[in-house]
């Protein structure tokens, strides 16, 4: 997994627009379906197709597009959406732009024109990754599909008319403003701008073999970076590749460089070609940042994380399963109707789950939400402190009014028997009058059950904070 859904503060209500400076034709679809699907999967390619419908709608300033569309129509949460977007961005088919202000966050997604089959198969990284995914026979079947019989023109002479042979040259010069006409941005391949290669060391090594540094042109540098990234070559390994790829005219053969680099890799890796693999959460950049922060429960960083995390993603993490449609609808209702922040909703849902044996009764949740809204609770920290406060036991007189309504305040004497989260375990001790009513045997068993639950819950909080 790459970036988390909350890395850019991505929320369901955030608006988006889609840009596309080309016309998607059947050739593009063939390349996407046949060549890119084995690399990034059907979900990512399907998301690319799905987003094309919003290009024209994005020109309508009165039409508001939000990320609820992806969640509702594709039946995915924002974390899954971000994972598929990561694949499209990394493979070079999409660019993402974001703008934050005090009121809202807006995203612009730019669809990039897929390359031609010729460019795809000539890309040293894409072609190798495809070969690794589909193996030898299927790779050549795909390649053959895009081939066509060319007419041999070697014995023909071109007799095409030039423009000036047919038309008069205009004498009047007209200045035309074309700044508003979008430029068809071609496919640039896999972006390796954040990858570095020691070209200075390579230059020194080649100099010892009396090889001119002029041989490493701009295009050669691009290919060297691609091959070094693909095959994990150092400056010394690249030196051997280059020395074996120089033609009799003292020029670099790019085709030979690719062959030499491939052979070098195969010898080092028991004839196994490199595969396209998605980084695991432990090695991804976003996970690295998360591990550095590693917020502890009740810390400012922990509250900030709750404010940024989608409640749907939180539910998926807590229950280790996809939230149901009714649960997603309930979260959307809390956001839209009650205007609650992510942090408040996350505290609310965790509060209810831990008190209701991991269940989420909608009526109960909406009643709490309504009360919290009336109390003016707007942040995760405020919700946390208030949840601790209302969870404290109350005597018979003070709780009687709430018992009739079945409110979440009406904990009465059974409060000490409720399942309690770690951050709610510090309560006021019950009064002597209340304690006298309890049976000592029941108290002992209750304390054992309570401590066992708190031990289990503490472990859960520690796991979630990592």
Swiss-Prot record:
It comes from the Bacteria. Belongs to the DnaB/DnaD family. InterPro entries: DnaD_dom (IPR006343). This is Replicative helicase loading/DNA remodeling protein DnaB. Residues 293-401 are annotated as: DDBH2-2. Helps DnaI load the DnaC replicative helicase onto single-stranded (ss)DNA. During DNA replication from the origin of replication (oriC) in the DNA replisome, DnaB and DnaD are required after DnaA and before subsequent helicase DnaC loading. Component of the replication restart primosome, which reloads the replicative helicase on sites other than oriC. Essential for replication initiation of the chromosome and plasmids. Remodels DNA, laterally compacts supercoiled plasmid and linear DNA. The keyword DNA-binding applies. The keyword DNA-binding applies. Residues 200-292 are annotated as: DDBH2-1. Residues 3-113 are annotated as: DDBH1. Keywords: DNA replication, DNA-binding, Primosome. Homotetramer, higher-order oligomers are induced by ssDNA. The DNA replisome assembles sequentially on oriC in this order; DnaA, DnaD, DnaB, DnaI-DnaC helicase. Part of the replication restart primosome, PriA binds first, then DnaD and subsequently DnaB bind.
């Amino acid at each position: 997994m790459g970036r988390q859904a909350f890395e850019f503060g991505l929320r369901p209500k955030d608006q988006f627009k889609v840009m596309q400076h080309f016309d998607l034709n059947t050739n593009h679809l063939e390349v996407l379906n046949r060549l890119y699907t084995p690399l990034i999967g059907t979900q990512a390619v399907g998301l690319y197709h799905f987003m094309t419908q919003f290009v024209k709608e994005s020109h309508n300033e009165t039409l508001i597009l939000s990320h609820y569309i992806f969640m509702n129509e594709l039946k995915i949460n924002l974390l899954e959406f971000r994972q598929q977007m990561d694949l499209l961005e990394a493979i070079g088919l999409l660019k993402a732009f974001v703008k934050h202000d005090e009121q809202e966050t807006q995203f612009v997604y730019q669809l990039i024109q897929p390359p031609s089959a010729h460019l795809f198969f000539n890309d040293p990284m894409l072609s190798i990754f495809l070969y690794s995914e589909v193996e030898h026979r299927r790779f050549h079947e795909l390649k053959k599909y895009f081939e066509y019989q060319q007419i041999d023109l070697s014995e023909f002479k071109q007799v095409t008319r030039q423009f000036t042979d047919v038309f008069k040259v205009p004498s009047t010069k007209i200045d035309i403003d074309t700044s508003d006409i979008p430029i068809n941005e071609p496919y640039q391949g896999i972006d390796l701008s954040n990858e570095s290669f020691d070209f200075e060391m390579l230059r020194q090594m080649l100099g010892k073999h009396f090889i001119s540094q002029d041989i490493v042109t701009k295009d050669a540098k691009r290919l060297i970076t691609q091959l070094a990234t693909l095959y994990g070559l150092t400056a010394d390994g690249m030196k051997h590749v280059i020395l074996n790829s120089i033609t009799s005219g003292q020029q670099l053969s790019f085709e030979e460089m690719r062959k030499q680099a491939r052979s070098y890799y195969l010898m080092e890796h028991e004839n196994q070609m490199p595969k396209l693999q998605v980084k695991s959460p432990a090695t991804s950049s976003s996970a690295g940042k998360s591990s550095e922060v590693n917020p502890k429960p009740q810390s400012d960083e922990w509250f900030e994380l709750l404010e940024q995390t989608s409640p749907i993603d939180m539910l998926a993490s807590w229950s280790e399963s996809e939230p149901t449609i009714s649960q997603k609808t309930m979260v959307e209702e809390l956001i839209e109707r009650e205007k609650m922040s992510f942090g408040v909703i996350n505290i609310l849902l965790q509060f209810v789950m831990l008190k209701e044996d991991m269940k989420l009764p909608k009526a109960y949740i909406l009643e709490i939400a309504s009360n919290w809204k009336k109390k003016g609770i707007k942040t995760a920290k405020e919700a946390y402190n208030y949840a601790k406060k209302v969870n404290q036991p109350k005597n018979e007189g003070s709780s009687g009014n709430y018992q009739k309504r079945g409110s979440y305040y009406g904990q009465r004497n059974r409060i000490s028997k409720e399942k309690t989260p770690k951050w709610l375990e510090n309560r006021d001790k019950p009064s002597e009058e209340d304690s006298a009513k309890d049976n000592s045997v029941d108290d002992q068993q209750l304390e054992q059950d309570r401590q066992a639950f708190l031990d289990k819950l503490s472990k859960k909080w520690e796991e979630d904070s990592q």
